UniProtKB/Swiss-Prot annotation:
GO terms for biological process: gluconeogenesis; glycolytic process. Pathway: Carbohydrate degradation; glycolysis; pyruvate from D-glyceraldehyde 3-phosphate: step 2/5. Its main location: cytoplasm. ATP binds at K204, E326, G352, G353, D354, T355. This is Phosphoglycerate kinase. It comes from Trichlorobacter lovleyi (strain ATCC BAA-1151 / DSM 17278 / SZ). It catalyses: (2R)-3-phosphoglycerate + ATP = (2R)-3-phospho-glyceroyl phosphate + ADP. Monomer.
Amino acid sequence: MPIRYIDQLKDLKGKKVFIRVDFNVPQDEKGNITEDTRIAGAVPTIKYAVEQGAKVVLASHLGRPKGEKKSKYTMAPAAKRLSQLLGKKVMQAPDCFGPDVSKIIDSMKPGDVVMLENVRFYPGEEKNDPEFAQQLVNGCEIYVNDAFAVSHRAHASVEAITKLVPTIAAGFLMKNEMTFFDKAMSNPVRPLVAILGGAKVSGKLEVLETLVNKVDKIVIGGGMAFTFLKAMGYGVGKSLVEDELIPTAKKIMDKAKKKGVTFYLPVDCVVANAFEANATNFVTTVQEIPEGWMALDIGPASATLFAETLRDAKTVIWNGPMGVFEMDAFCRGTFAVAEAVGNCYATTVIGGGDTDAAVNKAGVAAKVSYISTGGGAFLELLEGKILPGVKALDVKK
């Protein structure tokens, strides 16, 4: 799919450039940003547009205000943080369209940056309403999507707007996301190893069915592993199991065997008598999980086994933690895998949310080839889907 990037556009000077960013970042109760990776990730694109003399109009969502104006979801803290990262003032608009916003945009000078208010303050955003998209355009001549993490959503500021602006392009963050994903999945150096974790098989069913056709090894950890272990006949106590997916788990393992894909599951785990941070816990083999106990992390032998699978890997994709890593008693498996991924001699791509947080907590983020900003978007790419926000950038359409 041919996509044009912002550095391929001619003469941005004096032009109004609408950049869709994803500043949906965590904040504390006082509205202070606690983690700014997504804001920092968009800086190269914004900086480039500023240096080229564009009048930069930024749009993003924050949280789920459900189509209503709610002060706790204002973009003002993001604009303030961006000002610090850019080293220049970022104006905060009072809304995302309307006379007051038009007045600000019309008075902008080359190199100025304005942050529109939360686009999800209006129901038209999530409905992909073309009329709402038209209001967002506000005289902008160029549209740039640098919001990979929301590009799996066909929303007005991601999809509908691309039909209303003469020139469309992708930003540098989007380019990095697509380049590394393509390197890892479309044209990987093999062996290609996929590590999947997280709570439920149901959330990654399509991913698993796609990966079985593409990878050389699959490593399964986290709560989802216990549906597979039960499918193999193990008693798993009170561990999380999706009984209705046991037949599907069997089919996936059978398919992996037929395709010559090596399938790794935990051999031991940390079990607890309750889903609590201070619960009584101990390590046991997966064959000996006591009745009434639940597995909340992989054990040390599993961590060693999983690390061994990466020794000859040339490409590694990881999505999902190995246990309830937010609780100190059940974080060791995730951190051990993070260290193994960080230390392996391969192209390593980390996908989304919890995995990103785990890699940062483990202190190995700098050793990873690429950390994706997208959770749901990354998973949909793994499923083999074309993201609506990416499809909308197709210059041939």
